[in-house]
C-alpha cells in the first residue's frame, strides 16, 4: 500500500505529469474564454479564444515544457500594453488619413516596420510589446477599411476581447499550480560555483587552451541562464525581492570569478611560477557539491591569511569573490532580510547598462517588416481578393514576431507549416465536428478543448508547426456570435494564411541580414572602450560595474559567431584588461584626468565610425594616445604594477588592429 502511494506521489512530480497538466491548463483557458465570450454576447469570441491560446502556449513553446510561475502573467501584461499602443496608433493613422485609404495602408506598413525596429533594440523580454503594437494597428485598420467611422468601436471591442482572453489564461495558470523556479535557482547556484572552482583548478594546473576555452564558455552560458532565472523569479512573486537583489550581485561575483580564473591562467602561461605546496594540496582536491567548495574556499582563505607571499593576486581576488558568492547564495536560499555585510556587497558597485550593438540589425528587421506588409498590401489591392486582408495580417504577424529571434527563418517556417497543418485540422473541425455541436455549448467546448489538449502536448515538444497550427486553426474557425458555416470563406481564409506566411518567408530570405560582420566589429570595439574606460582617477567612475554589460555583449558574440574561438579569446582578454585596469592605483592628476577623457573620446569615435578608413585612423590615434599615456605614467615614476597593464593592453590592441578596425 505504501509502495503504491509513493509511486503515485512521484508521478505528480514527473515531467510527463507537468506536460499533461499544462495541456489541460491550455484547454481550460481556451474553453473558459469561449464560454465567457458567448455568455457576454461578444461579437467575435474568436479573438478572446485566440488570445488565451497564444498567451498560454507561447511561453510553453519557448521553454520547451510547462512555463514557470509568472511567465504567462507577464506575457499577458505585455500583450495588454502592446494592444493598447497598437489601438492608439491605429486611431491616429485613421484620423489623419481617413480620406486617403491607400496612404492609410502605407502608413500602417511604415508603423509596423517602425515597431519591429524598436522591438529589435529593446530588451528581449519587452520586445513582444512593440511587435504586437505593430500588427495590432494593421489588423484594426484592415478590418475597418470599409467602415472607418466604426474604428473606435472596433478598437474597444478588440481590447475587451483580448483582455478577457488574457484573464482566462492567467486564471487557468493560477488554478493549475504552476511550478516555481526557486528550486531550479537554488540548484543552479550550487552547480555554478562547483564549475567555477573546477575552472580555477584547470587554470592553476596549466591545462591546454581548448579545455580552458570550453570551461569558461560553458560558465558564461550558465551565468547568463541564472540571470534569466532571476527575471523569472521576480515575475513569480514580489516576496522574492531580496533574493532578486542578491542574485543581481551574485551574477557579478560569478563573472568576476570567471575573469580572475582566466587571468590567472594567462599570468601563469606568461610567467610560469610554481604553486605553493599547501595551495596545490587544497586545489587538487576534487569537489562535487556546494559544501565541498565552501570547505575548499575556507581553507584557501586561511592559507592566504597566514602567508600571502607568492600567491597570485588574481587568486586572492577569486577567493574574495567566491566568499561573497557563498554569502549571497546562503541569503538566496533563506530569502531573509539583508544583513549589513550583504548590504555593503550590494552597494559596492554601480551596474552600467550597455547600449545595443545591433542597430544595423534592427534596421534590417524593420525594413523586412515594412517591405513584407507593403507587398501584402499591393497584392490585396491589385487582386481584390476577399481574403487578401488575412494574407496581409499574417505577413505582419510573422515578420513582427520572428525578427527578434536568433533564427527568423525558422520562426517563419514554423508559421508556414502551422498554417498548412491548420487547413485539414480546421476543415475537420469546421465541416464535421462543430456543426454537430450547435445545439450544445458543452459539446462545442469539449471538441475545442480536445483539440487544444492535443496541440498543447505538441507545443511543449517544440514540434515544428505546432504553435502556428494552434493559432492558425483557431483563427480560421468562425467563432462568431452567431456562428455561420461558409465553406468558401473558410477556404479563402485558410489559403490566405498560407500565402501570407509564404510571402513573409520569401521576404526574410530575400532581404538578407548582412550586418553580422558589422555587429561583431562593433561588439569588439565596445570591449576596447570598456577596457580603456577603466583608466580613471575618479573614484565614482571606478565603482561603476561594467562586467555584466561586457559579458552580456560577450554572450551576444557567442550567439552571433558560434564557432569563432579567436573572437571569444580576444573579447575575454579585453574584459580581463578592464578588470585589471580598474584596480590600478592611479594618483590624482589633472593632466592624467584630461588624457583619460581624450582616450575615452577617441574610443567612442572608433565605435561610431561608419567607414573603414575613418575607423582605422581613429584606432591608430587611440594606439598613439595609449603609448603616450604609458610614457606619462613612467614620467610620474609610478611602479611597473601600474604601467605594465597599460603596455599589455596596447600590445593586445596592436596585435589585433586589423580585426578591430577593418
Curated annotation (Swiss-Prot):
Annotated GO biological process: carboxylic acid transport
Key words, A-Z: Cell inner membrane, Cell membrane, Membrane, Transmembrane, Transmembrane helix, Transport
Keyword Secreted found: no
Pfam family, one: FUSC
One GO CC term on file: plasma membrane
Membrane topology according to the record: Multi-pass membrane protein
Keyword field contains Plastid: no
Compartments in which it is found: Cell inner membrane
UniProt GO molecular function: transmembrane transporter activity
Membrane-spanning segments: 22-42, 52-72, 76-96, 102-122, 129-149, 161-181, 378-398, 415-435, 439-459, 465-485, 491-511
Highest taxon, organism lineage: Bacteria
PANTHER family linked to this entry: MULTIDRUG RESISTANCE PROTEIN MDTO, P-HYDROXYBENZOIC ACID EFFLUX PUMP SUBUNIT-RELATED
Family of this protein: Belongs to the aromatic acid exporter ArAE (TC 2.A.85) family.
Protein name: p-hydroxybenzoic acid efflux pump subunit AaeB
Biological source species: Pectobacterium atrosepticum (strain SCRI 1043 / ATCC BAA-672) (Erwinia carotovora subsp. atroseptica)
UniProt lineage: Bacteria, Pseudomonadati, Pseudomonadota, Gammaproteobacteria, Enterobacterales
